[in-house]
Amino acid sequence: MGEPMDYASSGVDIDLEAKAVASLIGSLASSSRAPGEFGAPVHLPGGFGGIIEFGDSCLALATDGVGSKLQIASKVGQLGGVGFDCVAMNVNDLICVGAEPLAFVDYIAVPEADPEVHSSLGESLSQACNIARVTLAGGETATLPGIVKELDLSGTALGWFPKGGGITGENLEEGDVLIGLPSSGIHSNGFTLVRAVIEVWLLIRRLLSVRSKPRLQRSQKILREGGSHNSG
């Protein structure tokens, strides 16, 4: 048996990252929108998305990226699934706060433009948005040879729910039924550690063939009847 692996040994200090995020949040200015106004922030404890007021509704925003899974996908020539990962990471976060995903925009950064790569990304993003029933409303493509050394892909999703309809977990009580949805495999979290642990490229190919799945179709009935999100 080799030495146990953790995030720190793979190059990611999650404790330092948590401190950095706390410093960022502490430096952000409060909203210029007062409660009751369009765009006023809505506090949702433990929420996976940013929420604002919008009349009788609330809008929810989530942003996330594919991360270091892109590095592996590029090396083994399997970029066809990363669009699914990008869309799923965002729409699944919206579902966690009780929002119905409506629209998605992507951000692609590359050191050098490659029509074949962009075509593969565009096709998978489009397919994923169709499956998740969200509109692919646009995006940004940046060629940044002086800043970006490898492909980076991220996105932002917009959703909505009626005011008062968000998932807060406030009504949880003993005896409630906990429903677990099966995972299709390793999605897009923890691939820096995966890369450090797994060195057999055949196994990596098999892992990459599993695409992240938007939870929308299986989750909406549950959400309509009330729910709470637990991630682990």
Give each language-model segment a name:
Residues 2-232:
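Helix-biased detector of long, well-ordered alpha-helical tracts
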